[in-house]
């Protein structure tokens, strides 16, 4: 279910730029997309409000209960994987248009298509991951994915041909599509009796999207856009090491 949820999220991310383009073309102002987003959010809330969820009785989640989880090294490692995976994606998507524009002399609007290509691959990756993860262990899957992602990022940083760069982005999207779901699921399995606290802590990991991009910006200002890509590279390397410690 986590992987399926990530699939739906990836589809929404991929459609975001398309909807903005439609709003600009049809209504003449891309900002008019926000009322549409508000309507979709309202309809989603009304739909969810009608659902009945049977939950077992559990104690309310408190800040103290969440903090105690941080003393568990395994949980802390999985949290850091989620932080870095979200930071990797946001940081990379922030850098891709300018990097492609500088690397291949592409117009910025065409270079920005690299982000849509990444999310297209991520959509395919989450869908495929739901099938593959039912057949092999999440540890092996994550290890192979991170190895391929490192190779793809290395190719992205060294190639100069636009086709090769777009292909590398596509592979990156495929390889990084299921990191969040795997880490989240592993955390829940490690402490099944504290699912609420674990869920609350893992969701906090999305804050990683606000951590890596500023660091990449500092590196880019000091050494250029190419050098800033070493930041997500280090994140991938950490996730590779963490995958080797994942419990089957």
What are the functions of these language-model segments?
Residues 4-53:
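Helix-loop-helix hairpin linking two adjacent transmembrane segments in secondary transporters
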Residues 53-78:
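Juxtamembrane intracellular "pre-TM" segments in multi-pass secondary transporters
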Residues 73-116, 123-126:
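Extracytoplasmic gate region of multi-pass secondary transporters
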Residues 140-155:
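Structural signature of the two symmetry-related core transmembrane helices
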Residues 1-17, 200-212:
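Glycine-rich segments within core transmembrane alpha-helices of 12-TM secondary carriers
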